[in-house]
Design a protein with these regions (language model features):
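Structural recognition of an alpha-helix C-terminal capping motif at a helix-to-coil junction
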Residues: 19, 33-40, 44, 53-65
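A short pre-motif secondary-structure segment
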Residues: 120-124
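Internal acidic/polar
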Residues: 69, 77-103, 108, 130-133
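Residues within helix-turn-helix
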Residues: 29, 132, 143
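DNA-recognition helix of helix-turn-helix
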Residues: 137-162
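Short helix-coil-helix linker/hinge
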Residues: 100, 110-117
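Short, basic, alpha-helical segments at the C-terminal edge of helix-turn-helix-like DNA-binding modules
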Residues: 162-169
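A short, charge-rich alpha-helical start-of-domain segment used by transcription regulators
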Residues: 1-19, 32, 43
Length: 169
């Protein structure tokens, strides 16, 4: 198979290879490396590519297998490091106190919101309802829900920033 024909088969799926690698490896650098390695593997099998009915599926399988191999290698090396540097999984007391304090502040801020904004914020950001469910519960249209949610988030953000910057400015 000539290089041009190979590239005609691979270029359309190159972006999908990268996105799959990025999703599995969660690092752009690792995903780029994986993409290059997969393309090299496909090039080494270029004479067999014409026998595959779906080149894209074959490329995705090669990508998945390569990424899983990389994750296994990384996991094994991480296990060695963890055994050598074992640390307690218990959250430090200071961090726990800070998180509890921050949650109390957030609760007070949410309680100070207008009732409609508080309800929509609770339904969308805390309980993870979608807009259709919120519209059904509140008898509001999607635009009004988005506006109220945006205002609630903005008010929360501004009050948290004001709290965090207290005494600094």
């Amino acid at each position: 198979m000539q290089e041009r024909i190979f590239l005609n088969h691979i270029n359309p799926v190159k972006d999908k290879i990268y996105r799959l690698a990025l999703r599995l490896l969660t690092s752009r650098d690792a995903a780029e490396d994986a993409t290059q390695e997969v393309i090299l593997k496909l090039w080494s099998r270029k004479d067999n590519i014409k026998h595959y009915a779906n080149v894209e599926a074959f490329a995705m399988t090669v990508t998945k297998n390569y990424c899983l191999d990389q994750l296994k290698l990384k996991q094994n090396s991480n296990l060695r490091i963890v055994h050598q540097n074992y640390e307690s999984k218990q959250i430090p007391l200071q961090k726990e106190i800070e998180v509890n304090d921050e949650m109390q502040w957030l609760g007070r801020i949410v309680d100070s919101l207008p009732e409609q904004q508080k309800l929509i914020f609770q339904l969308r950001d805390v309980e993870q309802h979608d807009y259709d469910e919120i519209a059904e519960i509140t008898n509001m249209n999607h635009t009004a829900i988005r506006v109220a949610l945006s205002r609630a988030r903005k008010a929360i953000r501004e009050k948290l920033i004001k709290k965090h910057n207290y005494g600094i400015k």
